[in-house]
Amino acid sequence: MKPSADMALFLTAVLKGAHATRQRHLNQARLIQAAIQQRWQLDNPWRWQLKHLQWFVRGHLAEHSPHSRYYYGLTVRLIVRRLGKERNWGEMCR
């Protein structure tokens, strides 16, 4: 089942850099979207709250390597920036 919201369209405003970097962020964003959809039935990133992204980082990625967590963390930051919740995200990470 493919998530219905288009992550490429959602992240277009914040994606910068080389083509390979943009593709990595898009692939990871789609995996984040699928995990959140499976857990909370929310496929539209505009409906996500910070708790959903926090769960992904702290819960879903707990068994992944530090390298993977780092790169997924960069993608999560892009999503947070696109949602306009950077200030709240910084407060949650303290």
Residue ranges, per PLM feature:
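Short terminal alpha-helical segments
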Residues: M1-A18
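Short, intrinsically disordered, charge-balanced linker/junction segments flanking boundaries
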Residues: M92-R94
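Non-catalytic DNA-binding core/recognition domains of DNA-processing enzymes
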Residues: L15-G90
